Amino acid sequence: MAITKDDILEAVSAMSVMELNDLVKAFEDKFGVSAAAVAVAGPAGGAAAPAAEEKTEFDVILKGAGANKVGVIKAVREITGLGLKEAKDLVDGAPKTVKEAMPKADADAAAKKLIEAGAEVEVK
């Protein structure tokens, strides 16, 4: 007759703390695993938890073209790879998102390029 889960649970519940410690060490050795507890921090507050998450993707938003519209169109073309007409339409339709879901460094570089061209930019 095979040993069932209930038989194992009954045997484990009858063991002392020292015997359980030895059993855990035997499992670690036999199966090459660690029984160390993983500490998981829960959210500190209900509504405040999402705000505590660090963003990894950012959107570059063109608020306005400023005085140097041609330079801003060129910068938009460099950043997005759009054609001349599409880039002009994007600049004319400001405020518009220039590029979405960019890493922080790329978003900052794109924003800097647009600002240098004379645009008003926001990174979200």
UniProtKB/Swiss-Prot annotation:
Protein name: Large ribosomal subunit protein bL12
Keyword annotations of the record: Ribonucleoprotein, Ribosomal protein
GO MF, one example: mRNA binding
Family from the record: Belongs to the bacterial ribosomal protein bL12 family.
Gene Ontology, cellular component aspect: cytosolic large ribosomal subunit
GO aspect biological process, one term: translation
Subunit structure: Homodimer. Part of the ribosomal stalk of the 50S ribosomal subunit. Forms a multimeric L10(L12)X complex, where L10 forms an elongated spine to which 2 to 4 L12 dimers bind in a sequential fashion. Binds GTP-bound translation factors.
Alphabetized PANTHER family for the sequence: 39S RIBOSOMAL PROTEIN L12, LARGE RIBOSOMAL SUBUNIT PROTEIN BL12M
Cited function: Forms part of the ribosomal stalk which helps the ribosome interact with GTP-bound translation factors. Is thus essential for accurate translation.
HAMAP family: Ribosomal_bL12 (MF_00368)
NCBIfam families, A to Z: L12 (TIGR00855)
Keyword flag Iron: no
Alphabetical list of InterPro entries matching this protein: Ribosomal_bL12 (IPR000206), Ribosomal_bL12_C (IPR013823), Ribosomal_bL12_C/ClpS-like (IPR014719), Ribosomal_bL12_oligo (IPR008932), Ribosomal_bL12_oligo_N_sf (IPR036235)
TM spans (from-to): none
